[in-house]
Structures are given as structure tokens and as C-alpha cells.
Amino acid sequence: MARYTGPSCRLCRRENMELFLKGERCYTDKCAIKRRNYPPGQHGQGRPKVSNYGIQLREKQKVRRIYGVLEKQFRSYFEEADRMRGVTGENLLSLLERRLDNVVYRLGFASSRTEARILVRHNHFTLNGRKANIPSIQLKAGDVVVLKEKSRKIACINESLDAVVRRGTPQWLELDKEGYKGVVKLLPAREDIAMPIQEQLIVELYSK
């Protein structure tokens, strides 16, 4: 499956919630879900009855799109979460949250996960003092993410850092805005993920 390159707002309307795929626009009245709160397409406003399987599938698609992960990789995350101790659904969300691109977004260096992924791939960050340009790198407690010196004058990064006050930084992360540095204080718990996700539906889908 190829990466989706169409209109981001269309995905939000399809999942009937804000996925925050377009950065600051998602916090304004220009957000598509606020203007047209129904699925895209000719029959979008009809909202037909959805089966249990359809509900489970939509939940999985929603989470995939939030984190920008393709199906094969998402399935791998689920299988890894299933092997871990604890609750499979919570393990899955923890693995997704600990991706480097998501941590960069959560710290406020980018206004969206898509933007964070681009910044990571273009070598703007170091992880524990070493080059890190793979968005899917799994971070652990104690890891330190630093924006490189040459990248600290990039306007969009500084604008995102200024806006992070409104969005807030999760409890499991610590941001040193002046030093352009973030630290993973501890692994994210389920209560640290405030998005309306029903991870048990994903577990049920993959367990069939």
C-alpha cells in the first residue's frame, strides 16, 4: 500500500474527527471537520449503518492515519505489542507514541506529525548525541532529542515551539525550549494519550 498523498482534510472527514494532520490550520475555524462534519463523497451525508467489523476497521484506520503509519508497519507494531507484557492495546499506543517523529511533534518542534517526519528525515535532530534520521526509531526513557544548531533559525520550527504552550507537552516528555532539547522522562501511559481512541476495537479486529 502506497502512502496517501491526497487532501489531508478528507481523511479527517472520513474518520469524523480531527486528526491534526495540517498543523495550525486544525486549530482554526478553517478545519474541514468544523465546516463539513460528514464523510466526503457523493453519499457522505447519508451515514449508513456500520457493522461491528466496519467499526473496528474504522478505528484501526483512524489510528493509522493519526500516526501516519502504513498497514504493514502498523500490523508489525500490533504483533510486537501482543508479545509484550501488559495490555496489548495500550502497548500498541505506547509503541506509536514513542516513534521519533511523534516525539518531535509532541515536544512542539513541528506543527504536525507529517512535518515532524520531514524534519527527522532531513537530519535536523540528534538522538543522544548521534545522527537520527529514521522517523520510526523507538525512544526509551532517558533519551535526549536535540535540534541541531544549524536548524534553530528555521521559522516553522520556532513558530511551532511558540504554539506548543497552547497544545501542551505530555507529562512523559520534558521540553527545554531555550536549549532546543527534549527528554523522554518515562514511557507513556494510557492516561497520557488523550485522543479519543478505542484501542480494544483494534485488538478485536486483528484477533479474528
From Swiss-Prot:
Q: Where is the S4 RNA-binding domain?
A: 98-158
Q: Name the UniProt key words of this record, in alphabetical order.
A: Ribonucleoprotein, Ribosomal protein, RNA-binding, rRNA-binding
Which GO MF terms are attached to this record?
A: rRNA binding; structural constituent of ribosome
An example GO biological process term is: ribosomal small subunit biogenesis
One GO cellular-component annotation of the UniProt record comes to:
small ribosomal subunit
According to the lineage, what is the superkingdom? Bacteria
Q: Which SMART domains match?
A: Ribosomal_S4, S4
Disulphide bridges: none
**What range does the record give for the signal peptide?**
none
Indicate the quaternary assembly. Part of the 30S ribosomal subunit. Contacts protein S5. The interaction surface between S4 and S5 is involved in control of translational fidelity.
Q: What does this protein do?
A: One of the primary rRNA binding proteins, it binds directly to 16S rRNA where it nucleates assembly of the body of the 30S subunit.
Q: Which HAMAP family match?
A: Ribosomal_uS4_B (MF_01306_B)
Family in the record? Belongs to the universal ribosomal protein uS4 family.
| Name of this chain's protein | Small ribosomal subunit protein uS4
Which gene name does the record give? rpsD
